[in-house]
UniProtKB/Swiss-Prot annotation:
Homotrimer. Belongs to the rhabdoviruses glycoprotein family. It comes from the Viruses. It is found in: Virion membrane. GO terms for cellular component: membrane; viral envelope; virion membrane. Residues 1-12 form the signal peptide. This is Glycoprotein. It is a single-pass type I membrane protein. It comes from Bovine ephemeral fever virus (strain BB7721). The chain crosses the membrane at residues 540-554. Glycans are attached at residues 175, 264, 416, 438, 507.
Amino acid sequence: MFKVLIITLLVNKIHLEKIYNVPVNCGELHPVKAHEIKCPQRLNELSLQAHHNLAKDEHYNKICRPQLKDDAHLEGFICRKQRWITKCSETWYFSTSIEYQILEVIPEYSGCTDAVKKLDQGALIPPYYPPAGCFWNTEMNQEIEFYVLIQHKPFLNPYDNLIYDSRFLTPCTINDSKTKGCPLKDITGTWIPDVRVEEISEHCNNKHWECITVKSFRSELNDKERLWEAPDIGLVHVNKGCLSTFCGKNGIIFEDGEWWSIENQTESDFQNFKIEKCKGKKPGFRMHTDRTEFEELDIKAELEHERCLNTISKILNKENINTLDMSYLAPTRPGRDYAYLFEQTSWQEKLCLSLPDSGRVSKDCNIDWRTSTRGGMVKKNHYGIGSYKRAWCEYRPFVDKNEDGYIDIQELNGHNMSGNHAILETAPAGGSSGNRLNVTLNGMIFVEPTKLYLHTKSLYEGIEDYQKLIKFEVMEYDNVEENLIRYEEDEKFKPVNLNPHEKSQINRTDIVREIQKGGKKVLSAVVGWFTSTAKAVRWTIWAVGAIVTTYAIYKLYKMVKSNSSHSKHREADLEGLQSTTKENMRVEKNDKNYQDLELGLYEEIRSIKGGSKQTGDDRFFDH
């Protein structure tokens, strides 16, 4: 997958040089009439109809480029082979156990392609567990094999024609993808192309590339430079670009980054020009420019033509024209065309006027009105173009090297400048005296014997040296695949991590792989736990459990507190019982002592009486 840089501005230092279209190497001047003066042919300067009479080796080329809207990805699938197993075990005492298992195996390429072909007959059968076969005192396994296709579009690099994807073990060739598929880092999957469509990305399908015709010619400013021009690309220096292949086709990356193929490549375009192969340069695709050169130049040509027609209208109406009006008759494009020289004539108009305060006194028209109180003759000098001449000249662009706004004769690079010129005078106006100008062809003014001033500049101004401010969609591929070698200049970019579990959408095979990590024996009902309905049930169970747990803790606390109170009462009762027992024991002891004393008394009495009547005493004590 390529990295899209949605906002990338290419800003080059703009250095505009003034370029003037000067008539040189002119032929002889010939007088013409006013109605024979005509405007130069002004076409859209970037159109193919605008000709270069002085261009060398001029011809047309057909160049093409991919459509920006096209995709550089290939249609295909990630193919997986799965065994869905149902295991049923039944014991002799009729206890049944059912287990489900999904086993991932390495798929065969032929089986994957067959599965793709079956898509034309409808969607593939969704995998399912086979019905359980349970028998008494037996363990039965039922399994079904399925090929699972997951639509996935890897990136086809148009420079090396290799297929890149973060899931691939290594970049894959187109031939390998057709014969054995592209192996993934996960060996249980293989990427295969969609055999139902052409094995090429839309980006590289040149059947619907954008093609234009360009004019190829040598630059008038530098014979060692070749230029291409067309309304779509403007004026391009071919030798400032570099050669690069794209989708297996030869082409040129222009200085501004655009890549174009050369459909009818000619040796004249590349001989004697230093066009080298690109080294590490990636092409971009122009999406927007901040100026519409073609439309602007079209409007400019129309306006210049209107100004030229206005100048001719003034000439035909015998109106005064100035050097700016004269400059509109000159072409702004290099080539061969007419250059005009205007010669001035003057005449004096005499009027007889009377002063307002002279009354009925007759005026004298033979005397000057300023020396008479009655009025007199007024003289008015008029200046105008009296004759017109033209010559067939070569119009060549010349750069104002010292950038002083003037063209020096030395800047003409040895080309002959016409020595014909005329002195034009301007009438006094606003209290100022008139001026005398040394004017040559097309209203050019000699401010010094070797220095010219031109009112208008060539349309080449700013076109050859103007660098467009362009927004690109640039394709970079060095950091897409993690296993690729990163060059030193690419370290500033953060590698793109496109691991399946981070970037891709979750599908049912993802949970299958996660299940296999934790254990192979999984009940099918577990999957339902992750559904939205089961989540609500799960949270309800948790809430009820929390309430029951809280209530149980509260009851336990009350029971412990109650038991503590009963134990205190029991201890008090025991203490009372012990004190009563001690008192009873004390009383019993006293009674015993009393009985002992009484017995001792009787013993003593018996001993006293024993001497006289022993038999009677014995009978007493028996009772």
